[in-house]
Amino acid sequence: MKDNVIPAFRRGYRMQWEAAQDSHVVLYPEGMAKLNETAVAILELVDGKQDVAAIVATLDARFPDAGGVGDDVKEFLQSAIEQKWIQCREPE
């Protein structure tokens, strides 16, 4: 995954707090997926404006003791693409 691509939720997909699940979830037309704290930290930055490098930089600053989260963030985003939650576009 290139650092300059910009991830965004696909149409019909969104992340929200679901009180019944007592957690954040990704809602999509066929159902929902319960998210862990790491997934929430990443997906809350997926806004269709920030590129992958900016998301990684924000999380590196937020979690300095993690020793660099870039590979993990990219791996998660790739998984979210495969799950069809998000899509990435090239910068304009």
UniProtKB/Swiss-Prot annotation:
InterPro entries: PQQD, PqqD_bac, PqqD_sf. Gene3D superfamilies: Coenzyme PQQ synthesis protein D (PqqD). Pathway: Cofactor biosynthesis; pyrroloquinoline quinone biosynthesis. Keywords: PQQ biosynthesis. Coiled coil: none annotated. The keyword rRNA processing does not apply. One of its GO terms (molecular function) is quinone binding. GO terms for biological process: pyrroloquinoline quinone biosynthetic process. HAMAP family: PQQ_syn_PqqD (MF_00655). Functions as a PqqA binding protein and presents PqqA to PqqE, in the pyrroloquinoline quinone (PQQ) biosynthetic pathway. Monomer. Interacts with PqqE. Belongs to the PqqD family. This is PqqA binding protein. It comes from Kluyvera intermedia (Enterobacter intermedius).
